[in-house]
Amino acid sequence: IHYPSEPVVTIKELQAMARYAKSSEYANFRTAVRLAATGSRSPAESIMYGMFAPPLRFGAFGISSLKGGMLLNHRIDFDTTSLHMASGVPYAVCDAYIPAAHIDTEYNGVGHEKENRRIHDGQRNNGLKGMGVTVLVINRDQMRDIVALEAIARSIHKAAGGLLRYRYSGV
């Protein structure tokens, strides 16, 4: 589900609040504001960003440390070949695009299980493939599976030419 409404509080407003909150009591708040990103269109995308993007020391997989970081709802316009591969779909909006790895991580909740949605997703994924972008789909169950999330993060780091130095239960 995507929410077309404006956020209740913007990152800019949170940053202003964080500058005002100087007490050590607000250290965690200031850190959270520093790590937050704009552009999420759903709670699941925000959670996915929180699991993958922040540095390892905060319990995430450090994707934001890769060149270009992790961009939420990044638009990729298709070239002519990719447009044909996508059956006329002119562009894709990636839930979370990692430029260094040429990977789009897509959260597919229950809405993506409907037939017309699967057809559209397949077309856009073909277009992205034509642009050299690999699409990694994360479903509801995988969002709760730390071993799966680690494996996905490891593959992203590898595609970016790096190495994830993190281990959970021997993966």
List each language-model region with its residue ranges.
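Surface segments flanking catalytic/ligand-binding clefts of nucleic-acid enzymes
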Residues: 3-171
